[in-house]
């Protein structure tokens, strides 16, 4: 999966981008969605879920922290949709500890984990992650999305194009 940028003029564009990215994700992948309130993070997660063909409606899990969406097909990964917005004010929040305390019905290594508001916290979940940033164009409904695989170990260097998904 290459790094990239897209202009998203409609909600459908955001869903399509999520679907395109979701088709390439596999078990053990971690995706971080970053952007201001209303930028389209949950809409993008819906597109990822649609491509992965998982059960259940994808809604913002803000008040429950995480939702597990099982795969409809055997052998395919589940989607764990996490929203850590309410943890942002807690200095030193332990995302992994919070997820462990939820007793999720799936092993995170067997799922694709999509984390809204996870910047600065997700590094404890994986050695690398797909960083997707959504920004709103002022006085417009247009969003700009950028995405790249980022290594979260060592010197925190971004993945080079030659490295297959930072592995």
Residue locations for each model-derived region?
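Phosphate-binding P-loop
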Residues: 23-28
